[in-house]
Every structure is written in C-alpha cells, then in structure tokens.
Amino acid sequence: MAKDLYAIGEAPPVGEVPARMHAQVVRPSRYGEPRDAIRDEVLDVPEPGPHDALVLVMASGVNFNNVWAARGVPVDVTRTQARWGEPTDFHIVGSDASGVVYALGSEVRHLEVGQHVVVHAGQWDHDDPWVLAGRDPGLASSFRVWGYDTCWGSVAQFTVVQAHQCLPKAEHLTWEEAAAPTLTGSTAYRMLHGWPPNTVQPGDVVLVWGGAGGLGSLAVQLVRLAGGRAVAVVSSEQKGRYCMELGAVGYVDRTRFDHWGVPPAWDSPEREAWTAGAKAFGAAIWDALGERTNPRIVFEHPGQDTIPTSNFVCDRGGMIVICAGTSGYDTMIDVRYL
C-alpha cells in the first residue's frame, strides 16, 4: 500500500498513488523574484478527470515562464487558472516533463498505467469545436499552456495532464533528455518551420538570439538539421563556443554593443549613434559568417531590447519570428526597414 507521502527522489510502486506530494509552488502572497516566490510545499495529489492522466514526474525542464509565474507579471497565473475551474490560491510551475503514467481517467483508451511518456505543453477543451474541426489547437479559444496558464505544472512529484499530452518516450533517451525539449523544442520548431514560405531552408542564415539558452540552443540545432546556417547571439565567449559545438557557424557577443532598446526619435541627434550601433551589430553578423549576407530569419524572444535591431538587420523578404518578450513588451519598428 502506498505511503501518504514519499521523499523527493523516492517513487511508490507503479499504480499506487499517495495522498500527498512535494511540489514547487508559487502563491499570490509571495509574488516576486523566483528565489523567494517558488518554494517546496506538500500538497494533495490531484485526481485525473475523465480525459486526464496522472503522471509521476521523472524529470522536468526549466523555462522563462517559471520566472513570469513567480513574479505574477505579465500574467497573474492564479487568476488565469480560475478560467479553467482550477485552484486559485497556488500555482505549481513547470511546462516540460517526462514520467510514468500512474492513473487514468475513465475515458482514456490510448494510454496504460506504467507507460513511459513525455508530456507536451498544449492543453485545450476536449470538445472545443475549433479543434474538432481539425484546426490548429494553438489558435483555439480554449488553448492554454500547461504549467503556466494552468495549476498543475511539472515541478512536482506528480502532475495531472490531459491524456493527449502524453506521448511515448523514446527508449534511447534518458529521462532528462526526454523532458528538456517538450516546450522549448516544440516552440523553436514551430518558429522555424511553422510559417511557410518563411521556413528555414538549406543555406539560409538564421540569427538566433540567446543561442545558449533553452530556446536558442534548440533553434541552433534545428537550423543545422535543416541545412541552414545559425549565427548565435550570446553574452560571453564561453556561450559562443558552446553554440558552435551545437552547430552554429558563428556567434556575436552582444556585450560588445550598447545600442539596445527603443531607438531615439528618427530625427534626433541621438538616433545617429543608435543607427551606428545597429550597423556595427550587422557587420558583426557578416564577420561571423565570413560573407556579407543578412539573416533571412531572425529567431526572436527578448522583444523590447532587440526587436528594433532585428528589424534593422533582417534581409529583404525575410522574417522576424517571435515567441516572447523577456526584456520587455513595448517595442518599436522603423517602417523604413520593413
């Protein structure tokens, strides 16, 4: 018989569900920096609904949405949870996982208790007419990101997810390898391959912001696999060398530049200095490539500090594709460079 609570790193027999679990939890009363806001707590293990699965988490990834959740900005995650009928007094962080199925809802037929799975981060209502019509679930009105828009994230001993989120784990991968790319990897893939005709092609130059981070490191590898040429933007030579090991053809150390952020007014004396900085950054891309070719795709996620520069260096007919705003949400586009 399962114990009431297992120590972190200890697992009950397959199929035996304890009453309580350890979890990394955020509460509205302590929104702030992650080191203070995210704390280990003991909570009741959630019960799966008819279309759900309860998964013992073997490994979980880390994403910037953990930071956003901890701060309660730009979204108060506990308020968002109310929309889905979930608890509103706490939030468990985490949107990547690999693990073992421990319990199933009454309507689930394609999974088995004991099955090893990876968990993707997309959730939606099972009866959403948009999804049932075969359209992109990510654009459905009921779409939400598990572990950010929802309560029961992955940094816990157990998580409850919609059954369709569970995919078979490849046997040759470790738990950690299987868990790492389920949110960042799918996001990076969609950014690079999801917007035809603006998809990475052999020979394409792709500028990857934050090349050594979770999104960027996967983007660099996906560009390489597609035959493209990734130029990583990093904050140190060490990170640049790491990106080269992943398959980047070159890198640019952004700490060499100081023109970041929203540019001064176009007709102000300060704008000339900003433009000189952006031109120097573009020249650094050419130096990294060894040729005067601008990026056909700019892989963006910092947002406010970098979008103006991305717009400046992107090639004619190219694409800036963005999934976040880690440096801020307000930005500016100079239409002369569109």
Question: PLM ranges: what are they?
Answer:
Residues D44-G61, P74-A133:
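Glycine-rich beta-strand-centered segment in the early N-terminal region that forms part
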Residues R83-E86, S95, Q123-G210, F257-S268:
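NAD(P)H dinucleotide-binding glycine-rich loop of Rossmann-like/cofactor-binding domains
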Residues T187, G214-L215, D305-T306:
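Hydrophobic/small residue at the entry helix of a nucleotide-binding pocket
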Residues Q201, C314-D315:
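Helix-to-beta-strand junctions that scaffold the AdoMet/dcAdoMet cofactor pocket
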Residues G210-G211, P302:
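NAD(P)H cofactor-binding loop motif with strongest signal on the N-terminal glycine-rich segment
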Residues L225-D305:
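Adenosine-nucleotide cofactor-binding segment
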Residues G318:
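Glycine-centered, small-residue-biased loops immediately flanking beta-strands
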Residues T326-L338:
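Rossmann-fold NAD(P)-binding glycine/threonine-rich loop
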